[in-house]
Amino acid sequence: MYVHRPDARIFYQVTGNGTRDLFLLPQCQVVTYSRMWKHQIPYLSRYFRVITMDPRGNGRSDRPPTGYDLQTRYDDLVAVLDEVARPPIALVAFSCAAPLAFRYAVAHPDRLSRLVLLSGQYAESVPQPFEERVARVIRDDFDNWRTRLFKRIFPEPHSLKGIEDCVTWAGETTPEVLIESLRAIDGINVYDLLGRVGVPTLALHGTDDKIVPYSHAEKMVAAIPGAKLVTFERGGHGLFGREAVKVNRFIRDFALGQEVPDTRIAATTERAVPSPAPPSAPRRAPRDSQRRVLWLSSPIGLGHIQRDLAIARRLREQNPDVVVDFLAGDPADRVVRHWGERVHPATRLLQNETAHFEGWAADHELHAFNALWDMDEIMTANFMTLADVVERDRYDLWIGDEGWDLDYFLHENPELKRAPYAFLTDFIGLLPMREDRTSTEFIRCWEKNAENVDHLRRHPDVRDLSILVGDEEDVLDREFGPDLPNMRQWAREHFRFSGYTFHFDPRALPERAALRAQLGYRSDERVILASVGGTRVGRGLLRKCAEAFTLIAGQIPESRLVLVGGPRLTEMEAAWGPRVEVRDYVPDLFAHHAAADLAIVQGGLTTTMELAALRTPFLYFPLRHHFEQQMHVARRLDRLGAGIRLDFEHTSPEALGAAMLEYLGKPVHSAPVTLDGTDRAARLIAGLL
């Protein structure tokens, strides 16, 4: 939506249906726009009708050559508020947008209910002489100027993602527009307005803010009648990103009318897990002595939720009083319901991680690390959902199966921990696809690995239990990166090893002939089963399997190809060829794998380990650029001598057809897979109850 000003269109957006309006105002300088609020909008829009705008000069607003003075910017703001706001509103102003907020608060006190100043300021100045020290540098070195600026805005360790985002957003304007915007606001000072601000005001500011010094904030707050100051020890200017959880909650509480006193927030490295739980923690009513578990399960692939359901059932067998609520997005929530288990109502509020990963996917290709790297706003939104759940109700245990959001934000905010916490994963270490230390992916992997190592070093009591779903030897024997620990040695120090977990017992399956009859396969036919998990990335592999099968079908007349698309791959082509069957989601796929004469799969851990345990011959195609499938899973399968690895790009339908013929029904001689991992994982978790 746009407001049309005499010289520019100003973009605004409304999110949420709350009864109260909340306006998030980015800074005046055009180095950012409304995207800077990506960690705030999804959460706050559950409570408010959230309004944002892109200031002239960046984002989806126009970029006129002039009009960047304070008065014109103020007129832009008023025009948007007049167009869309429902007074009285709560106004959140970041950085140099604060002078606009002060002007509006003084001119229209009846239209504001609350004012929040995030790293706010009342005056602005730029280095002089302007042309030499500012304009020329921006024109001649725009890229490096942006990088230097945002390194100052995010001085905290492990801030690379925030720096990268802001450098990108600043690059969406032009050097000339940026120069003009800086020139136009140089020398502004609205200190004389502060004493006339009558709206309840809250300031959030970091002591290490290198853009607006903390002393500036103290003077500003002292001049505003009744204003309160929340101090972030060692916090920088970019609190909206680095302290998103706390910023979100302070904004929520204050805008809803709660009083927030002057508060000092400890630096991240100094924060601690509360022990014992504070009296203010929510207390649940007695429920026949039930012990309640909140289980956050990654929906990226179905392996996580399948093993989690199996472990949960085994946990209840050992502890009948345990009740488990699952927080798991699509398609994992469908599996939970199919098993007849409890899906927490807040699941509907989760942002869809699977859809995000599919957005990074191409034909049999998934840049898994890049998808994880770019999932930060989803992680924030989903952690805020979980934080609200445990704020309202008490659980006796939290479990996160590759719940990267829960794990990251608990280490950043350990004081929010209210129950024992167990972390599960089936791999350790993020890996770049090529060992080029200058590449962006290598640097990002190092950053995230270093952050994870630092988290566990600084806050060893956040996790009460870390389980690797596998064995010590499954961890790669290599460093996380330069100057970082060896992965396997680090895992020995921080993890317990459950062995691989299965959601079924291969030993309990019927004899093969009976199983085939039960599943509708004739005893005299040869069954090739191709399955691609729970996402749409596998369409290309299914298509290639169908093409290969048509080439060899005449050589094996008593044969059938079954293509399993998964719950998110439903629009499969109808006519693949003779003796080709297409199926949607198959809940007990493992039974079909056990009955098959050959399986063809991607390189996902769950499916390949099931096939190894079932001793079914299989061909596997790791997704291109998927570090976990290409390296971590391949390590396990190599150790077992299981499966035949093929490369999707270099395997033609003819070559795949030849492999089908060679391995169809071929005896398997891989090492045996231990089958007690589910029991071991359940026993380890039970120790926390």
Ranges and model annotations:
Residues 432-435, 440-536, 566-568:
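A nucleotide-sugar donor-handling region in carbohydrate enzymes
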Residues 125-128, 140-195:
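Conserved alpha/beta-hydrolase catalytic His-Asp/Glu region
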Residues 197, 203-205, 209:
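Short beta-strand/loop motif that positions the catalytic acidic residue
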Residues 499-598, 649:
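Donor-nucleotide binding loops and adjacent catalytic segments primarily
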Residues 99-107, 112-141, 620:
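Flexible "cap/lid" loop of the alpha/beta hydrolase fold
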Residues 6-60:
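Conserved HGGG/HGGXW glycine-rich cap/lid loop of the alpha/beta-hydrolase fold
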Residues 36-38, 42, 52-92, 249:
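Active-site loop/oxyanion-hole signature of alpha/beta-hydrolase fold enzymes
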Residues 318, 322-373:
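Conserved nucleotide-sugar phosphate-binding/catalytic loop shared by glycosyltransferases and other
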